[in-house]
UniProtKB/Swiss-Prot annotation:
Subcellular location: Cytoplasm
Keywords: ATP-binding, Coenzyme A biosynthesis, Cytoplasm, Magnesium, Nucleotide-binding, Nucleotidyltransferase, Transferase
Predominant cellular place of this UniProt entry's protein: cytoplasm
Reaction catalysis annotation: (R)-4'-phosphopantetheine + ATP + H(+) = 3'-dephospho-CoA + diphosphate
BP GO terms, sorted: coenzyme A biosynthetic process
Protein family membership: Belongs to the bacterial CoaD family.
Any single Gene Ontology cellular-component annotation: cytoplasm
Complex and partners: Homohexamer.
Site (Transition state stabilizer): 26
Name of the protein: Phosphopantetheine adenylyltransferase
Residues that, per the record, bind ATP: 18-19, 26, 99-101, 109, 134-140
Taxonomic superkingdom: Bacteria
Length: 170
């Protein structure tokens, strides 16, 4: 059931993140967001506080490979610097989608949602709880485990696992 109605424009949701790399937790949120929106824009954010392992283009290709069968419904874009809520408006999005893993995520996300609401009332924030089996993983943790030779095979897609191996064990 999407938020699209017969007489309205297709519904668009923006799911932002650094996705460095994309994990099965991210994929779960994107797949569930597709049940709510006609189109999900996966917005690769540039975060000046984070030093990414993968370039923006590498992350874009990584994500697109995960969703080859959903081409057209999932659009991957690298977001230039600026306010995410403004990007959402430019894309015609009705909502910003955020995944929550724990209560500690909610505090920060709640502040962001309120600020975005103050800036642009027409864009909603939608929170999706990460599936229980992915609740403990993060991109940072995945990179750390991979760098130190741990098994991440059930936490990321195979092509992402290979790319991490290439980065850490060329």
């Amino acid at each position: 059931m999407s938020l699209h109605t017969e007489n309205s424009q297709p519904s668009i949701g923006v799911y932002p993140g650094t996705f460095d790399p994309i994990t099965n937790g991210h994929i779960d949120i994107i797949e569930r967001a597709l049940a709510l929106f006609d189109t999900v824009i996966v917005a690769i954010a540039v975060n000046g506080q984070k030093q990414p392992l993968f370039s923006g283009e590498e992350r874009k290709e990584m994500i697109e490979k995960c969703f080859e069968k959903e081409k057209g419904r999932i659009i991957v874009k690298i977001v230039p610097s600026g306010l995410l809520v403004n990007f959402a408006v430019e894309q015609g999005a009705r909502a910003i989608i955020r995944g929550l893993r724990a209560v500690s995520d909610f505090d920060y996300e709640f502040q962001l949602a309120l600020m975005n609401r103050k800036l642009v009332r027409e864009v909603e924030s939608i929170f999706l709880m990460t599936a229980f089996r992915w609740i403990y993983i993060s991109s940072s943790l995945i990179k750390d485990v991979s760098k130190n030779g741990g098994d991440i095979s059930d936490l990321v897609p195979k092509h992402v696992e290979r790319l991490l191996e290439e980065k850490y064990r060329p």
